């Protein structure tokens, strides 16, 4: 196993992979193209964290959602999955604010369960 310049592990000459875990479980994704996965237990939508990590449109989505904590967790996993697929890691909260709207490189598949949400980011 080797690591890229941002610390993401990879296997030379092997498929791409991504691993994530939380209290509710573990998730692994493998593909021939860059891929990212994030799994999170449903987390509280803390107002300060919302403002630091979500753009204005996402903030409105969270605040108007019937279940704000689920919406926050959904958006968070989408952003994390893309960052993992890119292999760059989260550099700043500002990066998270603009990550999804400008992103046309990845197709996202989000699955919601009772206690957790996970998203897989597939390279287009």
Which residues are covered by each model-predicted region?
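Core catalytic alpha/beta fold that binds nucleotide/phospho-ligands
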Residues: 1-124
